[in-house]
UniProtKB/Swiss-Prot annotation:
The keyword NADP appears for this protein: no
Pfam (any one): eIF-1a
Example of a GO MF term: translation initiation factor activity
Residue ranges constituting the S1-like domain according to the UniProt record: 1-73
Biological source species: Roseiflexus castenholzii (strain DSM 13941 / HLO8)
Protein name: Translation initiation factor IF-1
Top-level taxonomic group: Bacteria
Keywords: Cytoplasm, Initiation factor, Protein biosynthesis, RNA-binding, rRNA-binding
PANTHER family: TRANSLATION INITIATION FACTOR IF-1, CHLOROPLASTIC
The protein's assembly and partners: Component of the 30S ribosomal translation pre-initiation complex which assembles on the 30S ribosome in the order IF-2 and IF-3, IF-1 and N-formylmethionyl-tRNA(fMet); mRNA recruitment can occur at any time during PIC assembly.
SMART domains: S1 (SM00316)
Length: 73
């Protein structure tokens, strides 16, 4: 989905919705990260609920925070 080369993309599940469009996501490898919704998803009013499977982009500099770029159907 991303055109950036220096991001890590992983799949995960939403475990807890937080205020200000932030979410706690449990990744496939067992780690939990704090993630926010990407601007394009926000523009298109894509709803994310607890239990949804999502694609998360992680920066190699801070692996505890990420950006949700896709919600699987």
């Amino acid at each position: 989905m991303s055109k950036k080369k220096d991001v890590i993309e992983m799949e995960g599940t939403i475990t807890e919705p937080l205020p200000n469009a932030m979410f706690r996501v449990k990744l496939e490898n067992g780690h939990e990260v704090l993630a926010h919704i990407s601007g394009r998803m926000r523009m298109n009013y894509i709803r994310i609920l607890k239990g949804d499977r999502v694609l998360v982009e992680l920066s190699p500099y801070d692996l505890t925070r990420g950006r949700i770029t896709y919600r699987y159907k």
